[in-house]
From Swiss-Prot:
GO terms for molecular function: ATP binding; ubiquitin activating enzyme activity; ubiquitin-protein transferase activity. One of its GO terms (cellular component) is nucleus. GO terms for biological process: protein ubiquitination. The keyword Protein transport does not apply. The keyword ATP-binding applies. This is Ubiquitin-activating enzyme E1 2. ATP binds at residues 499, 525, 536, 549, 597-598. It comes from Arabidopsis thaliana (Mouse-ear cress).
């Protein structure tokens, strides 16, 4: 999945938990009106009309069981966000979506991918050419077909575990009762209030959602009933702290270790556990806290009569459910309450849009259509209606009805734009999940959004909006034909074809980007499709597993729009592929869209975009959160200008000897797995393939690490070599004894429970936890499971087949009983690292060279006893295959270690999330992020927008929170009468000498004292011998001194120059490109 790096400068809300569609009226080809008002034609009748068609995909063999098991391989990334209980609730939920234009199909896509029980698609109208601007399942061949029927097959392909069916006639109240959630797109307020009244009063209430996209404007209303319980208001894990002390006073004061800052807030409820001395706190009762500081808080409780605190204790936040009392739409229209704000520069916008959408609804009711694009008469009529409604609001009347904004709404009101549909499709899809499960806080109750900044800056003539009998007519009706041509001729580079990449390709295809004769879209991704991708990367199907992501995604995108000129590559973007993505490639691009999943690649692409001065549209997701950053040449800072602080890493001694949470245990477990099963076998093979060169490298290194590596190789080929499966069981059983008994006994011997530090303080003070050795038992399932996984994997490294009996508890227990386990004798001179700053566990002072020679002699003897062709199999950790025993072993290692230290254990799925470093991901936040980005794409390709028109966004669908802000401008460096930013690059032509380059800089008032190329120094004023280079060409110095190999297409060399002004003050200057041809 695509993780983001949160940029602190775009977060405007202090409440942020992180630092850093439809067509109600269409036109024919000649522009005449075709009445399709309220295209879903919703009416609450007591019976179904004779024209109703009901079609279920169950007819095609879909058997959706009520007791469906969660497919953890498919939904692992989503499970990391929602958890099993939420997923089970989704699997039991039936959802209706009425209105299958662009917004409706986006909502359906997202909730089908999420995995509800069933989705029913409702629409009474037919596909028109106009719909192809925003609906990715429609093609030209679908024109004239019922929208729901034209959608069902492709939507069913997204998830065969969801029953997708259709309704094509008028809905009845009885039919609404079949659903837990109903979503209505493109419906009048009159009909919406009638439906919502029924849903609100139904027992149990039916969650009602009304959503609309009108050009660059969108609205959303939620009513989940009179009493809706939110079980998890923010989606975050309960925070906890390790107690250092508790006072006996009124009120009690609690301090925690300074290992990690507390994430509590005043008024939180917490529970205590494992407290020694003041045991009254261990009663499990939630307690309210106040005066929260980074490492302390006060209890709202008198602890003066409690026992005296001795040591230990964990304090954990208790998450409280929240009950929301939703108002029905009829009441909420008159008294909307507080609006959810999206853009803090538009603080007064939501009340105006609340009025505007009501005015638009009245216009549609009176005229039987929505306003025509470019019609000043219709726009003025809309303004008059808004003024009339506003006059009747009494005390709630707005001081100003923004006629300019209403004009924009009128002009685009008939269009469903794909970026708006994608964005709102993600938001509404998440509201459906909330309604089904109580997971995350719903929108309460209205949400309005607009992106009028995306419109072209120059006024457009009415002829710009005229339909062209094109699939882009809806988009043209908002932006005009001139910008549409720019979209079609754009040359775009999409880096990544995962979840974000799939959404981007879909969006760009529908927008017509790179679909013209001059346009081209290049997508690259070096990854292949896995099963876990299918729950978010919606362009892929199960029959694509194992195929290249970029190729499959490109083919699917071309299927959405056959005019898309797309080229799919399987290359990683980095310094090693600059022969593929060369100067000519970058220079010919219009814009770059990142869809990456790692910071290193993001920074490289950012550096290329800065170098070639190309716009970069950056985005990322993490669970329900997303952010976007616009990197625009000369207008904004670049992506690399700001960095998040590095994640805190646990000290090595903590992970290896003093773990105090399950993350430490899993970090250690994965390290041991890779050392035992991947690195050591690989080292064995390296030695056996070329013993002379291998030992030469070891002697050259000659350090403790080389010594330890050789020791493991000798151990693997000598006393721990396995020749039968029983040997593998013996190895696994002895590993258990070593890890979970002997090492702990040695640690307790070296540092007994009453040990003290050199200052006299208790050694085993928080956060350290005193461990207990485990006694192996063949009746303990977790013990046997560990031995099973370890022995099977050990056998795999030696090429030994696994007998079937070894996969049974009884058979394995019998074999384990035959293993002789030596008695443990503690070492009096054992050294255990306790320094948190230590980077290695090797502390003994020995003659490494002598030990390496001794180990080499042993290896020579081992090699003589082996068959010449003998090699081990190095096992690479693969988290997403539940049949390979990898996670069984890692979870077993971690949980047994957790048991040693009385740390709560976790199941295999949770272990997979942590040890596999799985990035939580859901389709809704991904879709929303790409919608935000593509709204910025209009601005980029228009080419005339200022920095204040662009928006960086941070959003968290769990809260929900939307925080949009103007990007930060680039840092400006000034020198004399000149100024420059990171976007500038100085160019010197004429194949200059070093002297000529220095004189050229001198003319700018700069004294260069150092010139480097790559990692080599071409010139330094302090080195007298460098003055001998004055008459040499800079390019020749680059070749001869820096060893630069210039490809045939390259006509310049880049040098970094360090300069001072005449006052000896350093001046940072841009990169200098010296052209030699």
């Amino acid at each position: 999945m695509e993780p983001f790096v949160v940029k602190e400068n775009i977060i405007a809300s202090a409440s942020s938990p992180m630092k850093k569609r439809r067509i109600d009226h269409t036109e024919s080809a000649d522009g005449s009106a075709i009445n399709a008002s309220n295209s879903s034609s919703i009416g609450l009748n007591n019976s179904i009309g004779g024209n109703d068609t009901v079609m279920s995909m169950a007819e095609f063999g879909n058997d959706n069981s009520n007791n469906q098991e969660i497919d953890e391989d498919l939904h692992s990334r989503q499970l990391a966000v929602y958890g099993r209980e939420t997923m089970r609730k989704l699997f039991a939920s039936n959802v209706l979506i009425s209105g299958m234009q662009g917004l409706g199909v986006e909502i359906a896509k997202n909730i089908i991918l999420a995995g509800v029980k069933s989705v029913t698609l409702h629409d009474e109208n037919v596909v028109e050419l106009w719909d192809l601007s925003s609906n990715f399942v429609f093609t030209e061949e679908d024109i004239g077909k019922n929208r729901a029927l034209a959608s069902v097959h492709k939507l069913q392909e997204l998830n065969n575990a969801v029953a997708v069916s259709t309704l094509t006639g008028k809905l009845t109240k009885e039919q609404l009762s079949d659903f837990q959630v109903v979503v209505f797109v493109d419906i009048s307020f009159e009909k919406a209030t009638e439906i919502d009244d029924y849903c609100h009063s139904h027992q149990p209430p039916i969650a009602f959602i009304k959503a609309d996209v009108r050009g660059l404007f969108g609205s959303l209303f939620c009513d989940f009933g009179p009493h809706f319980t939110v079980l998890d208001v923010d989606g975050e894990e309960p925070h906890s702290g390790i107690i250092a002390s508790v006072s006996n006073e009124n009120p009690g004061f609690v301090s925690c270790v300074d290992d990690e800052r507390l994430e509590f807030e005043d008024g939180n409820l917490v529970v205590f556990s494992e407290v020694e001395g003041m045991t009254e706190l261990n009663d499990g009762k939630p307690r309210k806290i106040k005066n929260v500081k980074p490492f302390s808080f006060t209890l709202e409780e008198d602890t003066s009569s409690y026992g005296q605190y001795m040591k230990g204790g964990i304090v954990t936040q208790v998450k409280q459910p929240k009950v929301l009392n939703f108002k029905p739409l009829r009441e909420a229209l008159k008294d909307p309450g507080d609006f959810l704000l999206s853009d803090f520069s538009k603080f007064d916008r939501p009340p105006l849009l609340h009025l505007a959408f009501q005015a638009l609804d009245r216009f549609s009711s009176q005229a039987g259509r929505f306003p025509f694009a470019g019609s000043e008469e219709d726009a003025q009529k809309l303004v008059e209606i808004a003024v009339d409604i506003n006059e009747g609001l009494g005390d709630a009347r707005l001081e100003d009805v923004n006629s300019k904004l209403l004009r924009h709404l009128a002009f685009g009101s008939r269009a469903v734009l794909n970026p708006m549909a994608a964005m709102f499709g993600g938001i509404v899809g998440q509201e459906v999940v909330k309604a089904c499960s109580g997971k995350f806080h719903p929108i309460f109750q209205f949400f309005y959004f607009d992106s009028v900044e995306s419109l072209p800056k120059e006024p457009l003539d009415a002829s710009e909006f005229r339909p062209q009998n094109s699939r882009y007519d809806a988009q043209i009706s908002v932006f005009g034909s001139t910008l549409q041509k720019k979209l079609e001729d754009a040359r775009v580079f999409v880096v990544g074809a995962g979840a974000l990449g799939c959404e981007f390709l879909k969006n760009l295809a529908l927008m017509g980007v790179s679909c013209g004769t001059q346009g081209k879209l290049t997508v690259t991704d070096d990854d292949v499709i896995e099963k876990s991708n299918l729950s978010r990367q919606f362009l892929f199907r199960d029959w694509n597993i194992g195929q290249a992501k970029s190729t499959v995604a490109a083919t699917a995108a071309a299927g959405i729009n056959s005019r898309l000129n797309i080229d799919a590559l399987q290359n990683r973007v980095g310094p090693e592929t600059e022969n593929v993505f060369d100067d000519s490639f970058w220079e010919n691009l219009t814009v770059v869209v990142n869809a990456l999943d790692n910071v290193t690649a993001r920074l490289y692409v950012d550096s290329r975009c800065v170098y070639f001065q190309k716009p970069l549209l950056e985005s990322g997701t993490l669970g329900a959160k997303c952010n976007t950053q616009m990197v625009i040449p000369h207008l904004t800072e670049n992506y690399g200008a700001s960095r998040d602080p590095p994640e805190k890493q646990a000290p090595m001694c903590t992970v290896h000897s003093f773990p105090h949470n399950i993350d430490h245990c899993l970090t250690w477990a994965r390290s041991e797995f890779e050392g035992l099963l991947e690195k050591t076998p690989a080292e064995v093979n390296a030695y056996l393939s070329d013993p002379v060169e291998y030992m030469k490298a070891m002697r050259t290194a000659g350090d403790a690490q080389a010594r330890d590596t050789l020791g493991r190789v000798v151990e693997c080929l000598e006393k721990e070599k396995c020749n039968s499966f029983q040997d593998c069981i013996t190895w696994a059983r002895l590993r258990f004894e070593d890890y979970f008994a002997n090492r702990v006994k040695q640690l307790c011997y070296t540092f007994p429970e009453d040990a003290a530090t050199s200052t006299g303080a208790p050694f085993w003070s928080a956060p350290k936890r005193f461990p207990r050795p485990l006694q192996f038992s063949s009746t303990d399932l977790s013990h046997i499971n560990f031995v099973m996984a370890a022995s099977i994997l050990r056998a795999e490294t030696f090429g030994i087949p696994t007998p079937e009996w070894a996969k049974t508890r009884a058979g394995l227990a019998e074999a384990v009983e035959r293993v002789i386990v030596p008695d443990f004798e503690p070492k009096k001179d054992a050294t255990i690292v306790t320094d948190e700053k230590a980077t290695t566990l090797s502390t003994a002072s020995v003659d490494d060279a002598a030990v390496i020679d001794e180990l080499n002699a042993k290896l020579v003897r081992c090699r003589m006893s082996l068959q010449p062709e003998f090699r081990m199999k190095a096992i690479q950790f693969e988290k997403d295959d539940d049949t390979n025993y990898h996670m069984d072993m890692i979870a077993g290692l971690a949980n047994m270690r957790a048991r040693n230290y009385s740390v709560p254990e976790v199941d295999k799925l949770k272990a997979k999330f942590i040890a596999g470093r799985i990035i939580p991901a859901i389709a809704t936040s991904t879709a929303m992020a790409t919608g935000f980005v593509c709204l910025e794409m209009y601005k980029v390709l228009d080419g005339s927008h200022k920095v204040e028109d662009y928006r960086n966004t941070f959003a968290n669908l769990a809260l929900p929170l939307f925080s949009m802000a103007e990007p930060v401008p680039p840092k400006v460096v000034k020198h004399q009468d000149q100024s420059w930013t990171v976007w500038d690059r100085w160019v010197m032509r004429g194949n200059p000498t070093l002297r000529e380059l220095l004189d050229w800089l001198k003319e700018k008032g700069l004294n260069a004292y150092s010139i480097s190329c790559g990692s080599s120094l071409l010139y330094n004023s302090m080195f007298s011998r460098h003055k001998e280079r004055m008459n040499r060409r800079v390019v020749d110095l680059a070749r001869d001194v820096a060893g630069v190999e210039l490809p045939a297409y390259r006509r310049h060399v880049d040098v970094v120059v360090a300069c001072e002004d005449d006052n000896d003050a350093d001046v940072d200057i841009p990169l200098v490109s010296v052209y030699f041809a």
